């Protein structure tokens, strides 16, 4: 048997797509373009918001089947989501991945949330030319930050509502929310409730996959394949929507429309004390680990319809919990992956 034949056999037996690699050089270039602007990209600074939206559009349009602005009016001003799609000719429910590009106040917002936006920009490059099992829509949202958070003016609300109104079939949605800040210092990780420190540890060196109880097939499959990538230390949590932090991003609006949705995050202010501060700059980010998060998201997207991860679905035990009576501490032990 020659080497070529052996290689073909290995590929046939391999149940998953070989992982692509994000580019740390590209990540740095995108972070610079988004954060080092003349002014800050908040709702009161429309020229800079539009500058960043145009940049995102220019990157999307290099790689995607279709790219467009989704515009809407708030108090007489026009704001823009930037949307692109891959696998447009596939007749299956779409997978949405999104991140907001606006910031809160006069600060660069590198982790919150240029890091998430760079994630979807890199996903666009990595998905280009790939054979997909279902359509993938990447969205850069405007107006996630206060004073619009939890209002119908959020860009993600506008997008999710448009899918609902157009009767678009949606498999699931994943929000990339602050994926660039990590710390190996003991005590660098906080939580909304103290017992979580026992389960997840006190060091902010992991990425967290956040889901609510009662989630569907998408969140389970995505989480399994994200874990399967084995690129970065990963933790899972499936908790009641009432737990503080569970809905702190754009995925909450897809929940409102009845879609299966989740968040990939470094836990925001529970770890990164630069949150909503001028110190949230790209110089504080861990580009290497950020790239590993992007690689895992890509791996999950391209393998989402392959059922054989070689691992248990991380949702299975959590679903069992829904109909059982356990103490809250037992529940916390259960949600750990």
PLM regions with names:
Residues 1-22, 337:
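Bacterial Sec-dependent N-terminal signal peptides
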Residues 22, 26-33, 47-64, 115, ...:
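Extracytoplasmic/secreted proteins, especially bacterial periplasmic and envelope-associated proteins
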Residues 29-87, 237:
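A non-catalytic alpha/beta surface segment that caps or lines the substrate-entry region
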Residues 30-42, 99, 140-141, 200-205, ...:
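Acidic/histidine-rich, surface-exposed loop or edge segments in extracytoplasmic proteins
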Residues 41, 73-76, 88-91, 101-105, ...:
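Solvent-exposed loop/turn segments at secondary-structure junctions
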Residues 46, 172, 183-313:
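Active-site-adjacent substrate-binding region
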Residues 104-217, 246:
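Acidic/histidine-rich catalytic neighborhood of metal-dependent amide-processing enzymes
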């Amino acid at each position: 048997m020659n080497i070529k034949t052996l290689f073909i056999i290995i590929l046939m037996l391999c149940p998953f797509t070989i992982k692509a690699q994000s580019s740390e050089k590209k990540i740095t270039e995108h972070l610079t373009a988004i954060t080092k602007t003349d002014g800050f990209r908040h709702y009161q600074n429309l020229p800079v918001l539009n500058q960043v939206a145009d940049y995102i559009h220019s990157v999307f349009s290099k790689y995607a089947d279709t790219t467009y602005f989704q515009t809407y009016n708030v108090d007489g001003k026009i704001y823009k989501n930037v949307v692109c799609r891959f696998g447009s000719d596939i007749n299956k429910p779409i997978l949405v991945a999104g991140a907001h590009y606006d910031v809160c106040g006069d600060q660069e917002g590198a982790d919150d949330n240029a890091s998430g936006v760079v994630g979807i920009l890199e996903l666009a490059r990595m998905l280009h030319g790939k054979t997909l099992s279902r359509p993938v829509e990447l969205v850069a949202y405007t107006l996630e930050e206060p004073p619009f958070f939890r209002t119908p003016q959020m860009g993600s609300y506008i997008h999710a509502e448009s899918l609902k109104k157009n009767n678009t079939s949606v498999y699931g949605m994943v929000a990339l929310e602050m994926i660039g800040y990590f710390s190996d210092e003991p005590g660098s990780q906080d939580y909304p409730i103290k017992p979580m420190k026992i389960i997840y540890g006190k060091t902010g060196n992991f990425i967290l996959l956040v889901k609510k109880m009662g989630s569907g097939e998408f969140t389970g499959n995505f989480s399994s394949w994200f874990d399967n990538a084995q690129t970065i230390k990963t933790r899972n949590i499936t908790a009641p929507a009432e737990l503080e932090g569970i809905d702190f991003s754009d995925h909450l609006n897809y929940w409102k429309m009845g879609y299966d949705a989740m968040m990939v995050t470094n836990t925001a202010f529970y770890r990164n004390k630069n949150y909503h501060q001028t110190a949230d700059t790209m110089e504080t980010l861990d580009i290497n680990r950020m790239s590993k998060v992007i690689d895992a998201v890509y791996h999950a997207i391209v393998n989402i319809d392959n059922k054989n991860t070689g691992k248990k679905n991380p949702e299975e035990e959590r679903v069992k919990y829904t109909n059982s009576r356990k103490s809250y501490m037992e529940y916390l032990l259960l949600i750990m992956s």
